[in-house]
């Protein structure tokens, strides 16, 4: 079920338009765990693919949540390698809907 998180960040008030509500799906308790962001190109070379998958897998096994935008390429590889249940996706969805449907999601997803 999609739920909302109401939040207030004073620094955002200087902007004309900013999100006042975040929508999320999944395990909110993942936000309390150690996190690292893995993002990168949508068209990685083979070396980058291998390195991203190995890094995400090892960090996930160590209890670190992988935070990424969920886009195709490096972002999606990181989520897949982390086993998805230990990942957090932060996204403003547009053209990456297909990537989300490819992943058997069991972690935490938020969008504004």
Task: Show the residue positions of the predicted features.
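Glycine-biased, small-residue-rich flexible motifs in mid-sequence functional cores and linkers
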Residues: 2-112
